[in-house]
């Protein structure tokens, strides 16, 4: 994978993204459902932290994780679930293959 030779290439995008995330987080306080308000607040804190870390990595910061895993010699008996930053069950991998859309999603006129 090529190294990003211009770390400021995404500055404009982050300039739009971070205020957007702040607006969504602020909108959480207007939710009537207390559990929804708490969940959205938590999700936005996690999301903003992820994007700040992405920005640091694009700027040249070193990685914190372990080295890339070596490929498995044998296929696992069951397909693993997708990794998530939080342990919610809303975004697990589908246990079956999904169809792909080919062609335009717009109807012909």
From Swiss-Prot:
Region entry Probable targeting peptide, spans: 100-106
Residue stretches of biased makeup (Low complexity): 66-85
Residue sites binding Fe cation 2 per the record: 47
GO biological process, one term: intracellular iron ion homeostasis
GO cellular component: encapsulin nanocompartment
Region called Disordered, residue ranges: 61-94
A molecular function (GO) term: metal ion binding
Positions with a binding annotation for Fe cation 1: 47
Practical applications according to UniProt: The encapsulin and a cargo construct (an encB-encC-encD fusion) can be overexpressed in E.coli and in human HEK293T cells. In HEK293T in the presence of 0.5 M ferrous ammonium sulfate nanocompartments can be detected and used as cell markers. Coexpression of this nanocompartment with a larger nanocompartment from Q.thermotolerans (AC A0A0F5HPP7) allows of expression of different sized iron-rich particles. The encapsulin shell proteins are not seen to mix.
Compartment(s): Encapsulin nanocompartment
Keywords, comma-separated and alphabetical: Encapsulin nanocompartment, Iron, Iron storage, Metal-binding
Role summary: Cargo protein of a type 1 encapsulin nanocompartment. May help nucleate Fe atoms in the interior of the encapsulin nanocompartment. Present in about 47 copies/encapsulin nanocompartment.
Name of the protein in its database record: Encapsulin nanocompartment cargo protein EncD
């Amino acid at each position: 994978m090529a190294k990003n030779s211009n770390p400021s290439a995404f500055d404009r995008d982050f300039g739009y993204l971070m205020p957007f995330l702040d607006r969504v987080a602020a909108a959480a306080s207007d939710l009537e459902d207390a559990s929804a308000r708490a969940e959205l607040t938590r999700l936005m804190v996690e999301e903003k932290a992820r994007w700040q870390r992405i920005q640091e990595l694009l700027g040249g910061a070193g990685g914190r994780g372990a080295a890339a895993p070596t490929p498995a010699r044998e296929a696992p008996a069951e397909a693993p679930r997708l990794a998530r930053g939080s342990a919610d069950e809303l975004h697990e991998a589908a246990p079956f293959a999904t169809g792909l859309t080919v062609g335009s999603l717009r109807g012909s006129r």
